[in-house]
Amino acid sequence: VLRIPFMCNLGTKEGVSVTDGRFSKVWPANRSFFQALRSRGGLIGVAVDPLTSHECGNQRYLAIPWLDVCLAARLPNEIGEPLKPMPDRDVWLSDPTGKEAVAASEFEGKKLEAGWLPNGEIAIHWMEYVTDTGVPDVTAPPAPLEVTLDGKRLTWRANADPESGLSQFKI
């Protein structure tokens, strides 16, 4: 379990900045889980959504790239082979409820009390997310396929990637 990457994602109003009320025990429970794993070298981070409580906010903006990086690192080359271990060459660390992350080699605190981030790319997304949840998507959506003009009728087939989606068309 300690070698499996985890990310705890909760809203700030779940006991981080609001410490009473219906969801105030979410952060203490997450903190206990985080500390139990991280103190033993577990690969676990915390991403606090600064805008929400218990509802689903913009978590996907961090979750999708985080999962992409972790899956790309762990999936085997051949079907049936075991999962690969997470690489540790570009790990970044953060205060679990903070807003800044640094390369592990530059981290000055207690590393086994710090939030774990798999690499610099995710650390940048994490810092954007915990600041205002505004993780920009820098990937272009796939180009349309089977574009056909029949008289005045233009048709095409489009595939949306999970990160970019399709917010608009420009013709």
Residue ranges, per PLM feature:
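Short beta-strand elements bearing conserved aromatic residues within extracellular beta-rich modules
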Residues: 169-171
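Acidic catalytic loop of the alpha/beta-hydrolase fold
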Residues: 12-24, 53-54
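Residue-level signal for short, function-critical loop segments
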Residues: 12, 50, 160
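C-terminal catalytic histidine-bearing segment of alpha/beta-hydrolase fold enzymes
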Residues: 9, 35-142
